[in-house]
Swiss-Prot record:
Name the record gives this protein: Large ribosomal subunit protein uL18
Record CDD domains: Ribosomal_L18_L5e (cd00432)
UniProt-listed SUPFAM superfamilies: Translational machinery components
Keywords, alphabetical: Ribonucleoprotein, Ribosomal protein, RNA-binding, rRNA-binding
Subunit structure: Part of the 50S ribosomal subunit; part of the 5S rRNA/L5/L18/L25 subcomplex. Contacts the 5S and 23S rRNAs.
Function summary: This is one of the proteins that bind and probably mediate the attachment of the 5S RNA into the large ribosomal subunit, where it forms part of the central protuberance.
Disulfide cross-links: none
Any single Gene Ontology cellular-component annotation: cytosolic large ribosomal subunit
Transmembrane as UniProt keyword: no
Alphabetized InterPro entries for the sequence: Ribosomal_uL18_bac-type, Ribosomal_uL18_bac/euk
Family according to the record: Belongs to the universal ribosomal protein uL18 family.
GO biological process: translation
HAMAP family noted in UniProt: Ribosomal_uL18_B (MF_01337_B)
Length: 122
Protein backbone atom coordinates (compact mmCIF):
# COMPACT_ATOMS: atom_id res chain seq x y z
CA UNK A 1 0.00 0.00 0.00
CA UNK A 2 1.30 3.42 -0.93
CA UNK A 3 2.11 5.84 1.89
CA UNK A 4 0.16 9.08 1.67
CA UNK A 5 1.81 12.47 1.97
CA UNK A 6 0.20 13.04 5.37
CA UNK A 7 1.40 9.67 6.66
CA UNK A 8 4.92 10.40 5.42
CA UNK A 9 4.88 13.76 7.20
CA UNK A 10 3.69 12.16 10.43
CA UNK A 11 6.35 9.48 10.14
CA UNK A 12 9.08 12.12 9.64
CA UNK A 13 7.72 14.13 12.56
CA UNK A 14 7.86 11.14 14.92
CA UNK A 15 11.40 10.37 13.79
CA UNK A 16 12.50 13.98 14.33
CA UNK A 17 10.83 14.26 17.74
CA UNK A 18 12.73 11.21 18.99
CA UNK A 19 15.94 13.16 18.46
CA UNK A 20 14.91 16.78 19.07
CA UNK A 21 14.15 17.76 22.66
CA UNK A 22 13.96 21.23 24.16
CA UNK A 23 15.51 22.00 27.52
CA UNK A 24 15.27 25.17 29.63
CA UNK A 25 18.78 26.13 28.47
CA UNK A 26 18.09 25.33 24.81
CA UNK A 27 14.37 25.17 24.04
CA UNK A 28 12.81 23.80 20.88
CA UNK A 29 11.70 26.09 18.04
CA UNK A 30 8.72 24.17 16.66
CA UNK A 31 7.26 25.12 13.29
CA UNK A 32 3.81 24.17 12.05
CA UNK A 33 2.82 24.97 8.48
CA UNK A 34 -0.70 24.77 7.15
CA UNK A 35 -1.89 25.71 3.70
CA UNK A 36 -2.78 29.26 4.74
CA UNK A 37 -0.67 30.04 7.81
CA UNK A 38 2.60 29.31 9.57
CA UNK A 39 3.15 29.09 13.31
CA UNK A 40 6.35 29.08 15.38
CA UNK A 41 6.70 28.33 19.09
CA UNK A 42 9.69 28.20 21.39
CA UNK A 43 8.94 25.33 23.78
CA UNK A 44 10.57 24.06 26.96
CA UNK A 45 9.84 20.33 26.77
CA UNK A 46 10.94 19.66 30.35
CA UNK A 47 8.31 21.99 31.80
CA UNK A 48 5.96 21.42 28.83
CA UNK A 49 5.55 25.17 28.49
CA UNK A 50 5.50 27.48 25.48
CA UNK A 51 7.90 30.34 26.15
CA UNK A 52 7.23 32.55 23.11
CA UNK A 53 5.28 32.20 19.90
CA UNK A 54 4.46 33.98 16.66
CA UNK A 55 2.26 33.22 13.70
CA UNK A 56 0.66 34.76 10.68
CA UNK A 57 -2.48 35.16 12.80
CA UNK A 58 -0.85 37.56 15.30
CA UNK A 59 -2.59 40.90 15.56
CA UNK A 60 0.74 42.77 15.72
CA UNK A 61 1.89 41.25 12.44
CA UNK A 62 -1.31 41.54 10.41
CA UNK A 63 -0.29 44.81 8.77
CA UNK A 64 2.79 43.12 7.31
CA UNK A 65 0.61 40.55 5.55
CA UNK A 66 -1.77 42.96 3.82
CA UNK A 67 0.25 43.01 0.60
CA UNK A 68 2.12 39.70 0.70
CA UNK A 69 -0.51 37.29 2.02
CA UNK A 70 -0.03 34.72 4.76
CA UNK A 71 0.99 31.66 2.74
CA UNK A 72 4.22 33.03 1.29
CA UNK A 73 7.93 32.78 2.01
CA UNK A 74 7.93 36.49 2.87
CA UNK A 75 5.24 35.95 5.51
CA UNK A 76 7.23 33.06 6.96
CA UNK A 77 10.28 35.31 7.15
CA UNK A 78 8.28 37.94 9.05
CA UNK A 79 7.14 35.28 11.52
CA UNK A 80 10.72 34.00 11.87
CA UNK A 81 12.05 37.47 12.67
CA UNK A 82 9.20 38.06 15.10
CA UNK A 83 9.68 34.83 17.04
CA UNK A 84 13.43 35.45 17.17
CA UNK A 85 12.96 38.97 18.55
CA UNK A 86 10.51 37.72 21.16
CA UNK A 87 12.85 34.90 22.15
CA UNK A 88 15.79 37.26 22.49
CA UNK A 89 13.68 39.59 24.65
CA UNK A 90 12.85 36.59 26.85
CA UNK A 91 16.57 35.82 27.20
CA UNK A 92 16.65 32.85 24.83
CA UNK A 93 19.49 32.92 22.32
CA UNK A 94 19.97 29.22 21.47
CA UNK A 95 17.25 26.85 20.30
CA UNK A 96 16.86 23.44 18.71
CA UNK A 97 14.99 23.61 15.39
CA UNK A 98 11.99 21.29 14.92
CA UNK A 99 10.65 21.46 11.38
CA UNK A 100 7.56 19.50 12.36
CA UNK A 101 7.94 16.73 9.82
CA UNK A 102 7.91 19.14 6.91
CA UNK A 103 10.77 19.31 4.46
CA UNK A 104 13.38 22.01 5.06
CA UNK A 105 12.30 23.90 1.99
CA UNK A 106 10.16 26.88 1.09
CA UNK A 107 8.33 28.52 3.96
CA UNK A 108 9.96 26.40 6.67
CA UNK A 109 13.40 27.30 5.34
CA UNK A 110 12.47 30.99 5.06
CA UNK A 111 11.30 31.06 8.68
CA UNK A 112 14.48 29.36 9.89
CA UNK A 113 16.81 31.64 7.94
CA UNK A 114 14.98 34.77 9.13
CA UNK A 115 15.19 33.59 12.74
CA UNK A 116 18.93 33.01 12.33
CA UNK A 117 19.43 36.43 10.79
CA UNK A 118 17.51 38.01 13.67
CA UNK A 119 19.92 36.49 16.18
CA UNK A 120 18.72 33.02 17.19
CA UNK A 121 21.40 30.35 17.13
CA UNK A 122 20.63 26.84 15.90
Amino acid sequence: MKITRKAATQRRHRRIRRKVFGTPERPRLAVFRSHRHIYAQVIDDVAQHTLVSASTLDRELREAFKDIGTATREAAAVVGRSVAQRALQAGICQVVFDRGGKLYHGRVQALAEAAREAGLQF
